[in-house]
């Protein structure tokens, strides 16, 4: 037999209970907003440092990256009022240094804040103006940057320090496949001659042990000056006579001279590998580096034929 249960009539809440219930609802609605407001504000000059900060900070950080367009030449970037506004509420600021992003130092100097912490990656790895500024291509750089980021996030937000420390360990471990690719390339191609249009890949090339040629030409390209006729001729000769196994070119900073070198390489059967200064959208730092190393490995292998 099915017996229908009668629901007892609801009692009206007393004024005291109504106020308590309302307060509880409002408190639950406010909690997410408070949690979001408590996020540590991080501003990174370059998006690969911003990506590392996001991986270490997770849900506890709000990261803004200024240079994030892989189709833009970072050397031509000019700071805007929007850039300055992004720094107003920053608690942690990360930039490359070594004169790669001098606009950031100027902006920070113009809007000093006592509670803001600045991480200059060049200082962490002992580099200065005049050195190759493309520090993120050195396998030793990101572990150092990650440790500094985790430390400063822990100081800014002690309640979540354990999360930052754990995420730091995960990040460092996630670099092992990249390091393994570097080691494998070094074991197979150490001493192999290559060339490049610009020294973007220089530190990675050194880590692999490649013989990088035409460095004066590369510096001229990076500094937006004209390479000497002798340096241009030497570069062209290396490509035409296949004195180098691979041409590495910066696809974000193409000039008429570098485009000509790329054409000579392709016409002469020298494999070309594109590298960028800015991390592509939709990829992590690890994926970006691994993909470029895979492309280099394929080009070095093809260049032997």
Q: Which role fits each region the language model picked out?
A:
Residues 2, 36-305:
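Extracytoplasmic metal-acquisition and chelation regions
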Residues 12, 25-26, 39:
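Intrinsically disordered, low-complexity segments
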Residues 25-35:
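C-terminal segment of classical bacterial N-terminal signal peptides
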């Amino acid at each position: 037999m099915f017996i229908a249960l009668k629901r007892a009539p609801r009692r009206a809440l007393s004024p005291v209970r109504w106020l308590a219930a309302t307060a509880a609802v409002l408190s639950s609605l406010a909690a997410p907003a408070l949690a979001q407001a408590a996020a540590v504000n991080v501003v990174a000059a370059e998006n690969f440092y911003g990506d590392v900060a996001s991986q270490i900070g997770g849900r506890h950080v709000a990261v803004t990256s200024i240079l994030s367009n892989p189709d833009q030449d970072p050397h031509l970037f000019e700071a805007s009022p929007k850039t300055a506004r992004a720094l107003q509420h920053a608690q942690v600021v990360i930039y490359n240094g070594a004169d790669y992003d001098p606009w950031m130092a100027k902006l920070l100097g113009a809007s000093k804040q006592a509670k803001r912490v600045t991480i200059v990656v060049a200082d962490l790895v002992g580099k200065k103006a005049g050195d190759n500024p493309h520090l993120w291509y050195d396998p030793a750089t990101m572990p150092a940057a990650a440790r500094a980021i985790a430390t400063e996030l822990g100081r800014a937000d002690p309640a979540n320090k354990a999360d930052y420390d754990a995420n730091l360990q995960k990040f460092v471990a996630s670099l092992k496949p990249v390091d393994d690719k570097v080691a494998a390339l070094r074991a197979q191609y150490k001493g192999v001659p290559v060339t490049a249009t610009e020294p973007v890949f220089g530190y990675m090339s050194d880590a692999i042990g490649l013989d990088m040629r035409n460095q004066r030409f590369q510096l001229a390209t990076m500094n937006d000056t004209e390479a000497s006729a002798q340096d241009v001729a030497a570069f062209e000769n290396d490509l035409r006579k296949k004195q180098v196994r691979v041409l590495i070119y910066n696809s974000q900073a193409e000039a008429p001279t570098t485009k000509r070198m790329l054409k000579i390489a392709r016409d002469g059967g020298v494999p070309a590998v594109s590298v960028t200064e800015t991390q592509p959208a939709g990829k992590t730092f690890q994926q970006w580096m691994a993909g470029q190393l895979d492309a280099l490995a394929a080009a070095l292998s093809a260049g032997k034929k």
